[in-house]
A protein has these predicted regions:
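N-terminal capping segment at the start of a domain
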Residues: 5-21, 174-176
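Cofactor-binding active-site loop characterized by glycine-rich and histidine/acidic residues
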Residues: 15, 22, 27-163
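Glycine-rich beta-alpha junction loops
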Residues: 32, 64-65, 176-177, 211, ...
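Generic beta-sheet signal
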Residues: 56-58, 138-142, 169, 227-237
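Short acidic, glycine/serine/threonine-rich loops at helix termini
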Residues: 71, 99, 153-155, 181-185, ...
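Conserved thiamine diphosphate
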Residues: 136-138, 186-218
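A short alpha/beta connector and helix-capping loop motif
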Residues: 151-176, 232-234
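Glycine/aspartate-rich loop-and-adjacent alpha/beta segment that forms the canonical ThDP
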Residues: 212, 217-270
């Protein structure tokens, strides 16, 4: 998994460099999470396989991190090199924020924050009781940013989901504590997150969002339990993770990856 996350980060840098698009810091912070989700958690047959209709569902609610999603899909064989090289370009099919029509593996069009969890709750309700070819209940997994936890729609869905006994719904919050204009905890503090989610009836755990073994153990323990509660993992992460001069720096929410920056960043990843 660690090698996969490293390769995904390299792809993210390449995509950002070619397209000269922002949000590199946000994409790097969730590379480990996405590597785990696609490598170990999701049941995701290819779109031309019979059981694709019984796939698990993943929603990227923090859609400005689309580069990380595209890089992950490419690494695990769900997207072609041609597709990701056409990201954010004339004639390309992959936009800067996710578009459901761009790929069968993109489950939701997004951009405006706070919608991933409400949509995930509806999807989880609609597939309750449905099993895949492995005989397992289909899952819905959603990745959110910590800044979007400030959205009221998130808390409406958070209150509603436990009442529906959606144990096959899993939320991962990329808590890098940096959003568009500063520290999320200072602009509109959302703490104590654990107590809030737990009070609404979720199984809630705080984990290192760069420790894939820890995250996997938490998810597998939940899946094997008899709980009726949905799961939320508060994943403590570092914006720009893996590239020292980008780490924990607000400006890399916006800065572009020039050729010089790209080569220097690759050296750090090596």
């Amino acid at each position: 998994m660690r090698n996969a996350a490293l390769e995904i980060r390299k792809q993210i840098l390449g995509i950002a460099n070619r397209a000269k698009s922002p949000h590199i810091g946000s994409a790097l912070s969730c590379a480990d999470i996405l590597s785990l989700i696609y490598g170990e958690i999701l049941y995701l047959p290819y779109a031309n396989e019979v059981d694709f209709k019984n796939r698990d569902i993943f929603l990227l609610s923090k859609a400005h991190s689309a580069m990380a999603l595209y890089a992950s899909l490419y690494h695990y064989g769900y997207m072609s090199k041609e597709q990701i090289e056409g990201y954010y370009s004339n004639g390309g099919t992959l936009p800067a924020h996710t578009d459901k029509t761009s790929s069968p593996y993109i489950e939701m069009s997004a951009g405006s924050l706070g919608h991933g969890l409400p949509i995930a709750v509806g999807m989880a309700m609609s597939i309750r009781g449905q099993k895949n070819a492995q005989g397992k209940q289909r899952k819905v997994v959603v990745l959110m940013g910590d800044g979007e936890v400030q959205e009221g729609s998130v808390w409406e869905a958070a209150m509603f989901a436990p009442k529906q006994n959606l144990s096959h719904l899993m939320v991962l919050i990329d808590r890098n504590d940096l959003q568009g204009y500063g520290r999320a905890s200072e602009l509109l503090s959302y703490e104590p997150l654990e107590q809030k989610w737990s009070a609404f009836g979720w199984e809630c755990k705080r984990v290192d969002g760069h420790n894939m073994e820890m995250m996997k153990e938490s998810i597998m323990t939940h899946c094997l339990s008899q709980t009726h509660k949905p799961l939320v993992l508060i994943c403590d992460t570092t914006k720009g993770k893996g590239v020292g001069f980008m780490e924990n720096k607000l400006e890399w929410h916006y800065y572009l990856v020039s050729d010089e920056v790209y080569h220097n960043a690759l050296k750090e990843l090596q």
